[in-house]
Amino acid sequence: MTPDLLTPPKEMDSLSMEGLESAPGGWFDCEVQKAGPAEDGTIFIGLRHTGGAFNCWFSATPTMKREMLATALAALSGRKVVNVYLTSTDEYSVINRMYVVA
């Protein structure tokens, strides 16, 4: 079953990709498409790469989840691009850094 891009997952355990190789991570310029919390407190942020490489959900690193949600909402409401550092470009990977681009 393919996850719905409009709804973050309820359980991260169901997203196990055991045995599959991850896409490389790094720095990317993205548009924030959506952002918000899940029932367990995880913050999910939907990002679309400005170059079209991906358009999917990512989770904010737990130690900075409130700050990342605030940054994502600021970018979303201001229609700004964000520069993010991702562990991988695979869906539901972790966002480690996020900066709004002026």
Where are these regions (language model features)?
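Exposed beta-strand/loop interface patches that mediate assembly or binding
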Residues: T2-A102
